[in-house]
């Protein structure tokens, strides 16, 4: 049991010694992306090899003092596209291996764990340059990690490793050197703004909750993260769960709350498992529960698993769901800080916001403000996806430009394709163009151009992307996820989706563009909650920045990107066709005819424009008009 400050300091001292005593640590990425590509089997294989290796003492239990080799499951190591990822650490020397397979494990163990060789074929390679360690990889080296600083470096489930890395130092400092009001003052002075999308200053929320007369206060964490392609919060919850919990404990200490709730979306089973494990361990050692560290401060944590509704990311809908009611937004005021969970004053922040708090308390508000911009201090995590060379999880200072993220960190577009747009902020965000590449990525700057930082999804699109279809896709998502409580969102998004579907089907009219703009602005102004207010942004931003594509779809009945099925027509070039019959044999509706070894043709009246012929032609004889 860790019952007082002295006991915590002793555990930290011992944990640091154990961590430093390893001859080698095999760090297997167990982020969701790597688990999907087989990292669990790789972890098991390394355990099997190490167990049978002569003269090797492997760690089987936590805090094993006799072990000199540790096989660890870490959080996300970042370069998700190149998984499964494995790091071999000997002291300060770290080798980063990529795309590791089961058959590579024995070789890695013999050459890099027991020996000092590096296996070059498994290293990160780009443009003829080979990168040996994580710090040599531009994707990682050009980041500034605060929230993600432990991810990929330590065992995500080990309390000892978290404490050894500086964990709970901030809580210890707050409880023994600062009163609750001073903690709030530091958070407020740091200028940290909510990382869930709204960008409201976190300290202002805490200031409003703390002095309220009601003796019951709550802290709640929004771990919903429903944006398609976003996985930042999930990576923190599964890769560094103790950091999130420490951040919530600091909030609870500051606003005098005794209970905290983490709402986790249903699609994050590994996050739920890691958080449950962390809470159980902390309760067992006395760092959660009653009279923590003998200070009289008591705090209990609970996990609520969502049912997958996107709207539950909205504060009042989230608290309603935790209470057992249907997750739908309510009219405000009163706001969550006044009447939140069970109508009690509630601090509600997202995962990334809480994960920043320990560093702010430990290093001070001035240190935090030295990073980022004046109006948006600190760093921001982003999930970088789409038509880009390096996809994965990144963390950069606020104010970093899109150009730096896409071309310096992301490595540019795949196959040398031309950049067209970047969709930022998920279904609630907007699409920015090449002329916006040098815009600082912070809460205020991107807003001027019809986008939002949001939770941090970045989808890079190349010249083969149809922006009208992008707008239709996101409007379809938000329309399906609308709770239906208010008319502007329930009916308005449906009408906008119908117009967009009409345009991509080749039946649009020029007056439809005015209708989309009118509806979009009406929904943005009149909807009840943030989901409805931001739902039209992808449409409005593409109308502003890519209006010519809408006109092309309507007037010319043409999709230059060849994405909209209704506007495609497939043609066989008789000069290239060899009459192999493969296209005819695979056509699901028999629209292709021709004799063997003679040029074939497509009956456009029968063609359903599925593209099967294009996929099957090995001679490049079929093209799309």
Regions from the PLM with identified roles:
Residues 376-390, 396-398, 402, 563-608, ...:
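C-terminal accessory/binding modules appended to enzymatic or scaffolding proteins
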Residues 30-38, 81, 167, 187-209, ...:
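Conserved phosphate/anionic-ligand binding catalytic regions in large, soluble enzymes, centered on
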Residues 153-169, 221-233, 336-341, 383-388, ...:
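Gly-rich Lys/Arg/Thr-decorated short loops/hinges at beta-loop-alpha junctions or inter-strand turns
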Residues 123-187, 343, 349-364:
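Flexible inter-domain linker/hinge segments
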Residues 247-249, 399-414:
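Short amphipathic, charge-patterned alpha-helical segments
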Residues 2-24, 40-71, 82, 86-124, ...:
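Ferredoxin-type iron-sulfur electron-transfer modules in oxidoreductases and energy-metabolism complexes
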Residues 84-88, 488-494, 582-601, 612-625:
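Iron-sulfur cluster-binding cysteine motifs and their immediate structural context
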Residues 142-143, 272-398, 410:
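Hydrophobic alpha-helical positions that pack around
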